[in-house]
Amino acid sequence: MAEINGKTIETERDFTFSEAEYNQLMEEQRKERMKALRRHKLPEKLSLQDALLALTKQELEDIQYNLNLPMGNLNRTKKADMVAAIEPEVVNFVGRWFVSAFQEQKDIFDYACQHKGLLKDLQQEDYRLDYLRGVGVLYCGLQDGEMLWYMPEEIQAEYEKINNAAYADAVNLNTEVMRLAAGMVYYYGIIDYDQLYQKVCDQIDGELDFADFMGIIFNGGCWYPQVVTTEKDLMHESVMNPEALQTAQRQRGMVNYADFPYDKLFDAGQESYIESTEAYRALAQYFMKQKQLDVLQAAEAVNSINMILQNGYGMKEIMGFLK
C-alpha cells in the first residue's frame, strides 16, 4: 500500500484508492483533536505552572517524552509532582530550542510577547501548533467559548533574553538552511545527515557547526510537512519506499548526488513545490482541457503522477490512479 496526496493506493495488485475513506479518517482525527484541545480552560494567570497544571497527566507525560526526561509510573505519580519536576526542565529546554527557530515560528513568538502572551489569530487547524505545545512552548485554553493559544510568562522571559538583532540573523540562517535542505531532498529523495550537512554548508555564506545544523533539521522535520526526519537521514514526504531508494543508491556505488544551483534548491524547498517543466505544463493543460479540471486539481494530478514515477512505478499504476 502507498499514499499519494491523501489517496491510498494498492501498488502490488489492483491500483486503487478510497478518497472518501481517507477524508472520513481525517475528519474524525480533526474532531478528536479539537475535542482534546477544548477540554482546557484559559488560566487566569498565564504562568508556566498554571499552564502545566491545566494539562492532563497523559499530556504532561507527552512533554516528558518529547524532552527526553525520566518517566515514572503514570498511575502512581501525583500530577502536582509531575508539574514540579517538568516546570524547570521546560524552561531549560526552550532556552536551547529557541536557537533552532524559523522565521515563521519567530513571528508567532514575537506576536505573543507583544500581546501579553496571547495569540488570537492562529489557525486552529494547524497541526504544527501541537508540536509547539508538545515541547512546552505554547499552550491553549477556552475563554468565553473561544479557543486561545498563549505563551506562558516564563517562556516569554526566556525568549526575550535572546531576541535581539543577532538572534534575528540566526533565525534567517536557520530558515535558509532548512529551505535548502528541503530542496535537496525534493530532488534526491533521501540523503544521510553527514552528506546533507556538507552540501548545505557549500551553499551558505555563514558558519554552521554540525550540532546546530541537526537542531535545525529536527525542528524542520516537525514543522515542514514536506520533509521527514529519520535516525540517520532526511527524506522527502513523497518517498514511499525509502529502503528501496537507499538500496538503489548503494547499487550505484560511486555515483554522487547531482549538484544544483542555489536558486533551484531554494525554490524546490517550498511546501507543495512542483517543478514547472514543459512536460508538466503540457500534462496540466491536457487535464484542464480534456478532463475539465481546474488549475489546482490539474496541478495535484500531475504531482501525483510525478510521485508515482519517482517511486519506480509505471504506466499500469498511473492508469490505475487516473481511473
For each feature predicted by the language model, list its residue ranges.
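Short capping segments at the starts of secondary-structure elements
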Residues: L55, Q103, H115-K120, Y186-D194, ...
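Short, amphipathic alpha-helical interaction segments positioned at domain boundaries
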Residues: V94-W97, E153-Y188, M240-D267
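Non-catalytic interaction/regulatory modules that flank or connect domains
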Residues: L180-N219
